[in-house]
Regions:
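Acyl-donor (CoA/ACP) binding surface of acyl/acetyltransferases
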Residues: 1-27, 31-35, 71-189
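Short, charged/polar low-complexity linear motifs in solvent-exposed/disordered segments
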Residues: 45-47, 57-59, 104-106, 179-180
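Conserved GNAT-fold acetyl-CoA-binding loop/helix
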Residues: 37-57
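Short helix-loop boundary/capping segments at the starts of domains
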Residues: 34-37, 61
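A short helix-loop-beta-strand connector motif used in the catalytic cores of GNAT acetyltransferases and
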Residues: 57-69
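Generic, well-ordered alpha-helical segments
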Residues: 20, 31, 44-51, 62
């Protein structure tokens, strides 16, 4: 039987991760619009075709960024699952090479996938990919203290709390405090 190459960079039992493409715009924007109640006030992903195009272009072209879509795998005939449906996204921003070899993660689940463990699996795959083929050493997540879901996801993937940064990021019209969570390649070994 011939080997068929996967369209995913990494796969788990229920999801695979792949890079963003311009062709993902319509589904991504539709998922963002469906998920506004879930995302607010923490997250403001692009919700128009033009905003998605600019966002995807940065993730595709900028070497200091890497964007990954977390996609549901086919759950089998009659399951009601759509093969390849986008469940969420994980971006590695501010990638620094040289002696630092690090990046900062940002992520979001979409409403239809929330609470099903798909983002836990997807984030774990991205971390493995970052420490494997990307050869990074450290990843950091900055989460607002009240964002219990984001903090729980970071903790469940082995990130440790390293500190607190007052007025760190400008979000929704104000400077917001953040907790800093990190993981290193040695912690995952």
């Amino acid at each position: 039987m011939p080997h068929i190459a996967s369209r995913y960079l990494a796969e788990g039992p229920r999801v695979g991760i792949r890079h963003f493409t311009h062709e993902d715009g319509a589904e991504f924007v539709a998922r963002v619009r469906e998920s506004k109640d879930l995302h607010r006030p923490w997250l403001f992903p692009p919700d128009t075709a033009s905003a998605y195009a600019a966002y995807a272009e940065r993730l595709i072209e900028d070497p200091t960024k890497a964007g990954f879509l977390v996609c549901e795998k086919d759950a089998g005939e009659g399951s009601g699952s759509t093969t390849g449906s986008i469940a969420g996204f994980v971006n590695i921003n501010n990638i620094v090479e040289g002696a630092f070899l690090s990046g900062a993660l940002g992520y979001g689940a979409f409403a239809h996938a929330a609470g099903r463990g798909l983002m836990r699996e997807g984030l774990d795959l991205v971390v493995g990919y970052a420490f494997g083929p990307m050869r990074l050493h450290r990843l950091e997540i900055n989460a607002q203290p009240g964002n219990a879901g984001s903090i729980a996801l970071a903790r469940s993937c082995g990130f440790r709390l390293e500190g607190y940064s007052p007025n760190m990021l400008w979000i929704d019209g104000a400077w917001r405090d953040h907790e800093r969570w990190a993981v290193t390649a040695e912690m995952r070994a």
